[in-house]
Curated annotation (Swiss-Prot):
Organism per entry: Candida albicans (strain SC5314 / ATCC MYA-2876) (Yeast)
Protein name per Swiss-Prot or TrEMBL: Calpain-like protease palB/RIM13
Coiled-coil region: none
SMART domains (UniProt xref): CysPc
Keywords assigned by UniProt, alphabetized: Hydrolase, Protease, Thiol protease
Function: Required for the proteolytic cleavage of the transcription factor RIM101 in response to alkaline ambient pH.
């Protein structure tokens, strides 16, 4: 018999695709050759016209096995595996009219493997037992289909979606093959980015009383084929008949592929375009449903509405909505609604007008905008964009899983959220998110709180991975720690922040972005070649290229750099400890080098109190020749380790003498009251003892800290 052989042929072909997706080319070839072997066997005995089409497809597939595959192509097949045991392959298009959903690929005699039914081992009702039902009634009469209802199983969203699809004249029966008595069936559902085949049998949980765990029609009790679609749906949801619910927009998408839109209702107001939506509904271009919020039992009884329940919209006229309850109870089957305060969501599913352009991608939860997946799209006219988070083994996890879509009006990759004008932003814990873009060029940034797989689909325009505006990109990771966290520029410790040398050898356009913890900022200063490797010693506004306010978590700025040297200082307003990341995107190559955080290779410090004096001598000894000494003198009013710009501080100066000869080495006559301290730099030619003379303009009190850094060891005397 050819049918079982074709089922086996398809099984090996699908396995070949799956192995190829995980880069096991050897096994992919083995499976493909096995499918060719089966096909050749069938061709010798059965004159099926489809054999030629299958042969050509399989040979083409074999020839392509050594060609590289994109990650997106691989994920289409990898996403067939929701668990280790399950496999829901994409429907293969052999030619325009022939797919792997054809009944030729279903062995109607051999039963389904027991392993495929594991999720149905437990039932929500102990009285229910699985029984095999032979399905001989394949009636597609809309009258009986409109009378489908839910009973014990809390799947109002599924049943309401089914009813809405019937109202839209979508031939949902065609999702099943074969449409005759069989040991197993294929149901095609749209999930994880593709139309996929789900294999089920007709064993259903039957109750000993008149209650039901499956979808039924109260006007045709022998109509069981809708329950096959329901069983396939429950299979991919992962909990079988222990179903906890979904929403109507999601379910209608899975059943029909129509694009799901969820409109949140507030203050009892329907959207202003509700009449236009209903007009589209009457034209068969959308399906519509509505969902209640949380209602008390008393209020539910008064309103004839169910708490947290989805209804099909049956009619809209003169501000009154007629809804159909998916439950059986005839008295509450159709309800007229004038007050919408108790409804939370409007569900609209749009018939797609265009074939989607799709991209599959893996998501790893990472911080910062520039690390997120980004896609640029050019829309010539209004375009629907659908983001789908894939079903997986962890989809039913109790912890919330949200995803973000941020759309910016630019064609370039985003470094920080403030870099370009934001067009829209959506955050949702729903698995599917639909947005509409106006004509224009946009970059879409996607993020989530958990690792997962996504499919992004565009229904009227192609998109591509976003690229930075300029060709050259540098990324720098750093931190503010206990030694290097100077705070904002109004603090005396500002110069203790991380600092960098930047060199531009030619005129350069530069976009700089920064992400970090806390209120963050960066400042870029003009510098010179002779200060390479030297830290700035004050906040010199005359050399400052940019000024912007501190911002939470991110910062960005754009520059046009002329050839030269620059100093970059990154800071956190409150001197908090944390990490930061810099991204520098430039039109020409630039170099960025971190400046050492200390005065020298060897560092010592000395603290003293002024005690109503105005002079202090500090003796120290160098231990090597040509000692490059850098000295910083800082004043403090108390025990705090920083001063503010508004704090009192005396003007000070410092001079250096040879201790033995008393000859001056460096004399400074000018007093300086810089917030950031007084500095003295000198090269001491020989290892000797020296005197540092520190003076203040007037006698007084307070504390003074002297830091000495040197390329050779220095000893305080």
């Amino acid at each position: 018999m050819p049918t079982p052989c074709l089922e086996q042929f398809l099984h090996h072909l699908e396995k070949s695709h799956l192995y190829l997706s995980i880069d096991n080319t050897k096994q992919a070839k083995k499976e493909c050759l096995e499918s060719i072997k089966i096909l050749n066997s069938i061709a010798k005995t059965t004159p099926l016209p489809e054999i030629k089409v299958l042969s050509q497809y399989t040979l083409n597939h074999y020839e392509s096995l050594d060609k590289p595959r994109t990650i997106s192509d691989k994920l289409e097949w990898i996403s067939s595996k929701l668990t280790q045991e399950t496999f829901f392959p994409p429907v293969i298009q052999f030619n325009e009219n022939f797919t792997s959903h054809n009944e030729l690929f279903v062995d109607t005699i051999s039963p389904i493997q027991d392993n495929d039914n594991k999720i149905f081992e437990k039932l929500p009702n102990k009285l229910a037992k699985f029984e095999y039902i032979e399905i001989s009634n394949w009636d597609n009469d809309i009258t009986h289909l409109k009378n489908l209802y839910q009973d014990i199983l809390p799947n109002c969203s599924f049943v309401s979606s089914f009813l809405a699809i019937i109202d839209a004249n979508i031939p949902i029966i065609d999702t099943i093959t074969p449409q005759k008595s069989s040991q197993k069936y294929k149901v095609s559902l749209r999930f994880n980015g593709a139309l996929r085949n789900v294999i089920v049998d007709s064993k259903f949980p039957i109750m000993p009383n008149s209650r039901n765990l499956i979808i039924k029609s109260y006007s045709d009790t022998e109509l069981y084929w809708p329950a096959l679609i329901e069983k396939a749906y429950l299979t991919i949801m992962g909990n079988g008949y222990n179903f906890s619910g979904s929403n109507m927009a999601n379910d209608a998408y899975v059943l029909s592929g129509w694009l799901p839109q969820i409109i949140k209702l507030s203050n009892g107001q329907l959207p202003s375009n509700i009449d236009d939506l209903w007009r589209l509904r009457t034209q068969g271009k959308v399906t519509m449903g509505i969902g209640t919020g949380t209602l008390s039992k008393q209020l539910s009884s008064q309103l004839h509405l169910v708490s947290g329940h989805d209804y099909v919209i049956d009619n809209i006229k003169d501000g009154v909505i007629t809804v159909k309850n998916p439950w059986l109870d005839p008295k509450d089957r159709v309800v007229e609604i004038k007050n919408f305060n108790h409804f939370k969501y409007l569900y609209v599913n749009w018939k797609p007008d265009h074939k989607p352009y799709q991209h599959y991608f893996l998501y790893q939860a990472k911080p910062n905008t520039y690390n997120q997946p980004q896609f640029t799209i050019k829309c010539m006219e209004e375009t629907w964009i659908l983001l789908e988070r894939h079903l997986s083994e962890t989809s039913s996890s109790p912890s919330p899983h949200w995803m973000d879509m941020n759309v910016f009006e630019t064609e370039y990759k985003i470094i920080t959220p403030s870099q370009y004008k934001k067009y829209l932003s959506v955050e949702t814990n729903n698995r599917l998110q639909l947005i509409k873009l106006k004509p224009g060029v946009f970059t879409i940034v996607i993020s989530s709180n958990k690792p997962c797989r996504f499919t992004l689909s565009s229904f009227n325009a192609m998109f591509s991975k976003s690229k930075y505006k300029y060709d050259y990109t540098e990324t720098v990771n750093g931190e503010w720690n206990s030694d290097i966290n100077g705070g904002n520029w109004a603090m005396s410790t500002y110069i203790n922040n991380p600092q960098y040398d930047i060199i531009a050898k030619q005129t350069t356009e530069l976009i700089m972005g920064m992400h970090g913890q806390g209120q963050i900022n960066f400042h870029l200063f003009h510098s010179s070649s002779d200060s390479m490797g030297e830290r700035i010693q004050n906040f010199d506004k005359t050399k400052l290229i940019n000024y912007q306010n501190y911002n939470a978590s991110y910062q960005s700025s754009s520059y046009r750099l002329t050839p030269g040297h620059y100093k970059l200082v990154v800071s956190e307003y409150y001197r908090s400890i944390g990490t930061y990341q810099l991204v520098l995107n430039s039109s020409e190559p630039i170099t960025i080098t971190k400046i050492p955080p200390f005065l020298g290779l060897y560092n010592i410090s000395k603290s003293f109190n002024w005690d109503n004096t105005n002079r202090f001598k500090l003796k120290f000894e160098t231990t090597g020749y040509n000692s490059k000494v850098k000295i910083k003198i800082a004043y403090f009013n108390g025990e705090s380790d920083f001063e503010l710009q508004t704090s009192y501080r005396p003007a000070m100066r410092a001079s250096l003498f040879n201790s033995q000869t008393k000859q001056p080495i460096q004399i400074n006559e000018q007093f300086n009251d810089s917030l950031y301290g007084v500095f003295l730099h000198e090269i001491l030619p020989s290892p000797e003892e020296y005197i540092l003379l520190i003076e203040r303009f007037e006698i007084g009190y307070g504390r003074c800290v002297v830091e000495i850094g040197c390329n050779n060891k220095v000893i305080l005397k």
